[in-house]
């Protein structure tokens, strides 16, 4: 996704948003 709120999405992209 493109939402930083989506921890599930960014967890794979950045891994830092998974908090």
UniProtKB/Swiss-Prot annotation:
It is found in: Secreted. Its main location: secreted. Keywords: Allergen, Secreted, Transport. Transmembrane segments: none annotated. GO terms for cellular component: extracellular region. Belongs to the calycin superfamily. Lipocalin family. This is Dander allergen Equ c 2.0102.
């Amino acid at each position: 996704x493109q939402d930083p709120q989506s921890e599930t999405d960014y967890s794979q992209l950045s891994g830092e948003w998974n908090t």
